[in-house]
Swiss-Prot record:
Keywords: DNA-binding, Metal-binding, Nucleus, Repressor, Transcription, Transcription regulation, Zinc, Zinc-finger
Gene Ontology MF terms: DNA-binding transcription repressor activity, RNA polymerase II-specific; RNA polymerase II cis-regulatory region sequence-specific DNA binding; zinc ion binding
Gene3D superfamilies listed in its UniProt record: 2.30.30.1190
Compartments, as annotated in UniProt: Nucleus
Entry function: Transcription repressor.
Name of this chain's protein: Zinc finger CCCH-type with G patch domain-containing protein
Length: 512
């Protein structure tokens, strides 16, 4: 009775734990924690059920023992039959002795396996053997030397492997041999292997082989086209029919190199290569995912190579480096390049630390890159300021470029509108230096010489065309325009020479 009392105490403890788990489930909304609580609840319920069966079994054995002890006549008759069987070995009534029944304590270590997942073998009709994920639903521990487990396959690939829905509900009218579906397969516990968790990260690779659940509950082979890890859905192209379906991750089983169903035409080398490709793609996907969690750096690693051929970055990319990730095979190294620091010359480290403290701990205080950027910004501002000053400044060269040299592209009508501007610009001649006036006078003389040569060339061409023709008229217009430009240049030369004469007279008067 002490064993039954211990089991009753265990049942009470299990019920208290089950109540605590249900209370925790009410306060948990979703996520992996809720899934673990649901699994724990199912395990506790299964444990309570098994413990109750054990208590009932022990109570039944005690009652049978009491009944057999009270009936002495039956025991005496049984004893006499056994004596007669020993005296007459050839007697028809002789029966072999029953094997010793396995005690409940010896079966106890195997009861924890009920409800657990494993990888169990299945022998197909054509004789091939393959392992599939399965669930242990019961155990046959009558012989401790050969304990058998009844399993139901989680991802059945053929009809004889699909669990019978009516059998699970207890309503199937057929026995194990007559039913088209599976009532569970008895497999030696020594042949079971560890359960393989689905590796959904393999779905990131396009072309990954998977088993997909059909409407008839049979899992068929397919190929991944796209996968969305936010909605937990993926598009699969089935090998049979070549049609595409969209399924949740829970209805998909990614196949690794060892899980792909083998055939006579497939070789082991192909599966090994696919497994290696999956490992490489998985590592690269993990590196990319880790790089997305890093903050965006201010400077790209290898940014200095824009001034070179960039051979270093090309070599790193061929070696598997992912842009934006850290250095190293797993992308756990530095992302931001080490910045060069230039400390003040002839100063101690204490003085440099004091300067950094005064700058509120600025890490870029002695950075070479930051210093070059500051100098670049200062130079850009200085250049912009000088450009604005030069643009607003009016001298004789601006006057020549805008009024004299630029008038060759204008028409006679535009020349009339430029005359007032020329008069205004002539008022700026006193602000020009004597050197600039001399250079401007030289340029005007050179421009006048070129215009006179153009007039001679056009006049020579004019003699080759008949008067009144279109070409003759165009040449006359060009000659008139050149002469007008010469007239403008002469006026400007006169203004410059007059300004120079005024300066000479003023200098002489000053000396006098």
């Amino acid at each position: 009775m002490s064993g039954s009392q211990d089991l009753n105490d265990s049942i009470r403890i299990y019920n208290e734990q089950l109540a605590q788990v249900e209370q925790a489930l009410e306060g948990t909304s979703s996520g992996p924690e809720r899934e673990s609580l649901i699994n724990l609840k199912s395990d506790l319920e299964e444990l309570v059920k098994l413990t109750l069966e054990t208590v009932q079994h022990e109570n039944g054995d005690d009652l049978n023992a009491a009944a057999s002890g009270s009936n002495e006549d039956d025991e005496f008759a049984l004893f006499m039959r056994e004596i007669n069987a020993l005296d007459d070995p050839g007697s028809v009534d002789a029966k072999p002795p029953k094997p010793d029944e396995v005690s409940v304590d010896e079966q106890e270590p195997f009861k924890d396996l009920v409800g657990s997942k494993c990888s169990a073998p299945h022998i197909h009709k054509w004789g091939s053997k393959s392992y599939h994920n399965a669930l242990i639903c019961s155990l046959d521990a009558s012989d401790l030397d050969d304990v058998a487990a009844k399993v139901l396959f989680i991802n059945p690939t053929h009809q004889e492997m699909v669990p019978c829905a009516y059998f699970l509900e207890g309503d199937c009218k057929f026995n194990d041999e007559m039913c088209r579906f599976s009532h569970g397969e008895l497999i030696s516990i020594n042949e079971l292997k560890e359960y393989r968790e689905p590796r959904f990260e393999l779905l990131r690779k396009k072309g990954c082989k998977v088993l997909a659940k059909n409407r008839n509950r049979i899992w068929s082979k397919g190929t991944i086209q796209t996968a969305d890890f936010e909605t937990k859905t993926c598009k699969i192209q089935m090998d049979e029919g070549r049609h595409e379906v969209e399924l949740q991750f829970e209805n998909v089983l990614p196949l690794e190199g060892d899980d792909v169903p083998s055939s006579d035409s497939e070789s082991n080398s192909d599966s090994d290569e696919e497994n290696e490709d999956d490992v490489v793609s998985l590592q690269q996907a993990q590196i990319i995912e880790r790089s997305l969690l890093n903050p965006a750096p201010d400077q790209r690693l290898g940014d200095w190579e824009k001034h070179t051929k960039g051979i270093g970055s090309k070599i790193m990319l061929k070696m598997g480096y992912v842009v934006g990730a850290g250095l190293g095979s797993k992308g756990e190294g530095i992302v931001v390049p080490v910045s060069a620091q230039v400390l003040p010359q002839g100063r101690s480290l204490d003085y440099c630390m004091q300067l950094r403290e005064q700058a509120n701990g600025d890490k870029n205080l002695f950075s070479v890159e930051k210093k070059l950027q500051r100098e670049k910004r200062i130079q850009e501002k200085r250049d912009a300021k000088n450009y604005a000053a030069n643009k607003s400044k009016k001298d004789v060269f601006n006057f020549l470029n805008s009024e004299i040299f630029g008038s060759s592209n204008g028409s006679s009508s535009s020349s009339g509108s430029k005359k007032p501007a020329a008069k205004d610009n002539q008022m700026d001649l006193p602000s020009c230096s004597s050197k600039n006036l001399n250079i401007a006078s030289l340029k005007l003389s050179e421009q006048m010489r070129r215009l006179e040569l153009d007039i001679d060339r056009l006049s020579h061409s004019l003699t080759r065309h008949q008067p009144g023709s279109k070409m003759h008229s165009n040449l006359q217009k060009q000659i008139a325009e050149k002469r007008r430009e010469i007239s403008e240049i002469k006026k400007t030369e006169y203004s410059i020479s007059r300004e120079q004469q005024l300066r000479n007279d003023k200098r002489k008067m000053t000396v006098f």
